[in-house]
């Protein structure tokens, strides 16, 4: 698959009320989903979780999340949110499969819904911002900040893995190139991945590379801007490159068929000398 199939520019998947609407059918895979809903002041949006678990993550602004399940009834979480994805870490809400959800925002805002098809029905929960592990990964021009709000070892989900990355302007991240497209116990996980991008400042841009790990595999070299997404069904991915003077944000959403929810990656053999700066 090529850049045309896997690079989704801003608006390419818009499906009111969603500015971004990427599900398994649109992506051509089985597990991972991402939606971004934009609410006007006083606006609200209702949806049903179906056979997926979801995390409601404020990108800009705060909201109230009401969650109703047949087994536990209704609960409500107040998400303080944030001014922008570049400002700080946000709190979030976990939505179990089969739930009914209402998101409402007095001041308006933008909210990501990261999802994964799943089997277990876990309880609805609130994720406080102070409890999100923040990792300073890499060094020099490969330094970046990783917000592990729903990584495999920081927050319990059935299948969903999601993190945020801030790459300073002029730096590389998602580097060295790595992959997670095979099930090799103890060495590599099989995970579909969505990159959703925002760039700080007007006219900012970045670049994303994905190249094949097998014949006919994913092959992308894309200029990305705010609101763009890149799909990684397979293949080596990285680097993600931020334009000098413009910090780059991306939200990674991952899920796969493995019985164990884990993030295990394999580095490209041509770049093994740089893996020490990755984690």
Model-derived regions, located:
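Double-stranded beta-helix
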Residues: 84, 109-151, 244, 251-279
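Glycine- and acidic-residue-biased ligand/ion/polar-headgroup-sensing regions
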Residues: 50-77, 95, 169, 181-229, ...
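Conserved hydrophobic/aromatic beta-strand scaffold that supports enzyme active sites
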Residues: 34-38, 92-94, 113, 162-166, ...
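Acidic/histidine-enriched, beta-strand-rich ligand/metal-binding domains
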Residues: 198, 203-279
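Extended, compositionally biased flexible segments
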Residues: 26, 33-104
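A short glycine-rich, His/Asp/Glu-containing loop-to-beta-strand
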Residues: 12-46, 53, 143-194
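Short, structured patches in soluble enzyme cores that scaffold and shape functional sites
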Residues: 97, 105, 113-117, 150, ...
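Conserved metal-binding segment of the jelly-roll/cupin
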Residues: 86-106, 116, 223-244
